Every structure is written in structure tokens, then in C-alpha cells.
């Protein structure tokens, strides 16, 4: 069992139940999955660059990314149907908790001028953020990076509100900006 999973089962569940007064233990929010995605439309023109970004995403997540493909052809964007335009990875279980632990303790402190993430969620218990650079991850070899590439990370929880979601993620180690 990972350190974060153990922390969740032993401490975080109890503190969430006390704070929000859940009558049933099944109401306590749980982290369901983490989705990491990259939009690689510019890199789609260069196959070597596209492959390099897929390898980077694979190193960051620990599993093979799924290539997302264009549904329609759009002549204005020089896009063809079925062309690879992005990549995503869905983390669940042990890998999810390991990534969350690494992200909170190693990656987020490496972000330049980091003062915490925004507390805005989607209103349904999910939280998303965008990163401008993949080089903050320790798995990435800086000498092999040809082009900086951003990514989106989404935490999907069973929380019903943004407050419950951000409280869960904050107790797990994600740092948020304090409200003024």
C-alpha cells in the first residue's frame, strides 16, 4: 500500500467525515482517477517530435499513453481525419496514488514562482490544472527535450462540491492559494 493511500484510509477519511458531517461512510469523497493529457497538434507534423512527447508522457505517468485522433478533417487547420493530435493517460489505483505523491512533494515545488494552485474546480467534484512545461518532472532528461510542451492534469473525485474536492486534494498534499 502506498504512503498516500495509507494516509487517506487512516487519517483523511476521518477528518473529512468530521469536517463535513457525513452520515454514511460511503459519502466520503474518494479520488477516482487522474487524467494527464497533452495537445500535440503542432508536433503532429513532425513524427519524431510526436514520438518524443509520447515517450515523455510515458516516463511521467509510468504507462503507455493513448493517442487521441482527429474526428473530422478541417482544411483551415491542415488537419486530417484520424490524424494523431494529442495523447492522454488515465491513472487509477496504485499508479494514481504514486503519481499524486510525486506531484505534490517533488514536482509542484519545482514550479517557478509557485504560490499554490487556484481553488476553482468544475463544480462537480473534479479539479483541473494546466502546466506550461514538462521539464519540472524529474523523470524528464533535460538534454533530450527538443520542445517544451504543456499538459493538463485532471483529478476526478466522488466529491459533490468544489469545497469537498479541494479539501480532499489539500489533505492529500496539493497546495492551493489561500483565499484573501
UniProtKB/Swiss-Prot annotation:
Transmembrane segments: none annotated. One of its GO terms (molecular function) is rRNA binding. It comes from the Bacteria. GO terms for cellular component: ribonucleoprotein complex; ribosome. Pfam families: Ribosomal_L5, Ribosomal_L5_C. The keyword RNA-binding applies. SUPFAM superfamilies: RL5-like. GO terms for biological process: translation. Keywords: Ribonucleoprotein, Ribosomal protein, RNA-binding, rRNA-binding, tRNA-binding. This is one of the proteins that bind and probably mediate the attachment of the 5S RNA into the large ribosomal subunit, where it forms part of the central protuberance. In the 70S ribosome it contacts protein S13 of the 30S subunit (bridge B1b), connecting the 2 subunits; this bridge is implicated in subunit movement. Contacts the P site tRNA; the 5S rRNA and some of its associated proteins might help stabilize positioning of ribosome-bound tRNAs. Belongs to the universal ribosomal protein uL5 family. HAMAP family: Ribosomal_uL5_B. Part of the 50S ribosomal subunit; part of the 5S rRNA/L5/L18/L25 subcomplex. Contacts the 5S rRNA and the P site tRNA. Forms a bridge to the 30S subunit in the 70S ribosome. This is Large ribosomal subunit protein uL5. It comes from Chlamydia caviae (strain ATCC VR-813 / DSM 19441 / 03DC25 / GPIC). The lineage of its organism: Bacteria, Pseudomonadati, Chlamydiota, Chlamydiia, Chlamydiales.
